[in-house]
Amino acid sequence: MEVGVTLAQEAKTQAMTHTESRAHFAMWAVTSAPLILDLSIDLADASVVEANWDIIANREVICVSQTWSGHPGYLVKSANNTFVAACVAWTCENHTLPEYQIWAKPQPNGTFAVLLVNIDATGPSGLTNLIVPLSELFPPRDFRGG
């Protein structure tokens, strides 16, 4: 997981914006991946800690990560509309990506944590009234015998 990566810290990859870092942290949480902070808060540059504290200390995101209800988060919906992301890192190629993805993670009492990831920097088209059929969140099951 990367939060607060700047070009000066990692020359081989493109730096993530604060918004991208927030989304990345949330993705790790919703997929139940371990949240490991590779930063000694007492030894780190105070400006790095301050700039990212709202991400790494977000109690709600950490709670989603730490809550286990039998299943990690899963992809519910991926946009049909795509865009081409031009890669600026020296080892990377352009990629066709969906404009957005919706992820869900089961929580206690039959609730779900839902994460909308806006992948396209210009904003997804037609996302003002997003409809996700319940059958996509809750796959139908036949509980009758057999």
Regions inferred by a protein language model and the residue ranges of each:
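Glycan-recognition surfaces
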Residues: 1-40
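Catalytic cores of secreted or luminal carbohydrate-active enzymes
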Residues: 26-93
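Carbohydrate-binding surface patches
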Residues: 28-38, 91-140
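Generic surface-pattern signal
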Residues: 6, 57-61, 139
